[in-house]
Amino acid sequence: PGDISEDEAAARVAGAISGAHVRVDDAFTGRANLFAQCNGVLVAEPALVDALNAVDEQVTLATLPHHRAVVDGEMIGTVKVIPFAVAEHMVAHAVAAFPRHALRVAPYQPKRIAVISTLLPGLKPATVEKTLRVMGERIAPAHAGIVADERVAHEQAALIAAIKKHIDACDMMIVFGASAITDRRDVIP
């Protein structure tokens, strides 16, 4: 009496702590896995995870690191109940240690990105193309997009003009320099 099965306990804890954009799988063998329902950033405050884990060794929560980028469908954590049954009051204490629905995924907000690349004689066009391709791959999970791609001479006046041209049409601007920045008087800083 007063005990609940491992699956029911895992499901209760997982359901109570899981918030926005987190899907809880059906518990099986005392384990309820948690999955991201969108691309974004995992919010799993370490102090809250530790507080839940400190309640009793019979109920554990493991998550990916706090503020880690995650993708839709990725497993982000698991609640595991170790014994076949646990006291109902202990499950209530575990749930109370973690604010309701505090484990969540903060979805990315799509951003418009302007890219300005400075050019010097001898810089291969393939270098700029590869830089843009790799950046495009990296921002794709965040649903961000390159809305402007401008290439200008590696000179301060040309860079300033390009920045002014695109500043109002984007949420973010990235400048790729044709040469390394060595001091404050360089073109880019």
Protein language model features and the residues they cover:
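Solvent-exposed alpha-helices and their adjacent loops that cap or buttress functional pockets
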Residues: 24-27, 68-70, 104-109, 165-167
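Short glycine/threonine-rich loop/turn motifs
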Residues: 119-120, 130, 143-189
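Active-site glycine-rich loop that binds ribose-phosphate moieties when present
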Residues: 54-63, 89-104, 131-134, 155-158
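Glycine-rich phosphate/diphosphate-binding loop of Rossmann-like nucleotide-binding domains
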Residues: 98-154
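Phosphate-interaction motifs
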Residues: 1-91
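A short secondary-structure junction signal
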Residues: 89, 125-129, 186
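Fold-independent oxyanion-binding glycine-rich loops
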Residues: 37-38, 79-81, 116-120, 176-179
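Solvent-exposed alpha-helical segments within well-ordered globular domains of core cellular machineries
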Residues: 11, 15, 115, 133, ...
